[in-house]
């Protein structure tokens, strides 16, 4: 009986610590700083970019990669599981990778 109680307590501690770590990560990803980092490091949309309308949102047809830090920022977002479909910054909408399956498609879009 004692071993059973000890096992339950240890399991609770492990799960609780994991949940706490995940919560911190999500908070970090959801922060304006993280969104700003994705905006500045990942995509820079030229002022003369042509926009297409999709479900009432304006989306840049072509994006320019600032540097290879883009990949790391997007991977962090995926790891945190807290990525928006569209991130609005300075009046522009940016497509965001929401899972590993869309990551390749997103990278292809960014590298065009």
Swiss-Prot record:
Listed transmembrane segments: none
CC per GO annotation: extracellular region
Removed propeptide positions: 22-65
Signal peptide: 1-21
Subcellular location(s) per record: Secreted
Tissue: Expressed by the venom gland.
Keyword hit for Transport: no
Record keywords, A-Z: Disulfide bond, Ion channel impairing toxin, Neurotoxin, Secreted, Signal, Toxin, Voltage-gated sodium channel impairing toxin
GO molecular function annotation: sodium channel regulator activity; toxin activity
Miscellaneous remark of the record: Negative results: does not show effects on sodium channels hNav1.3/SCN3A, hNav1.4/SCN4A, hNav1.5/SCN5A, hNav1.8/SCN10A and potassium channel hKv11.1/KCNH2. The synthetic peptide has been found to be inactive against Nav1.7/SCN9A at concentrations up to 1 uM, in contrast to the isolated natural peptide described in PubMed:24082113. Intraperitoneal injection of this toxin has no effect on blood pressure, heart rate, or motor function (as judged by a swim test) at doses up to 1-10 umol/kg.
Summary of the function given for this chain in its UniProt record: Gating-modifier toxin that inhibits voltage-gated sodium channel with a preference for hNav1.7/SCN9A (IC(50)=25.4 nM) over hNav1.1/SCN1A (IC(50)=4.1 uM), hNav1.2/SCN2A (IC(50)=813 nM), and hNav1.6/SCN8A (IC(50)=15.2 uM). Is an effective analgesic in rodent pain models, since it is several-fold more effective than morphine in a rodent model of formalin-induced pain and is equipotent with morphine in its ability to reduce thermal and acid-induced pain.
Protein name: Mu-scoloptoxin(03)-Ssm2a
Species the sequence originates in: Scolopendra mutilans
High-level lineage: Eukaryota, Metazoa, Ecdysozoa, Arthropoda, Myriapoda
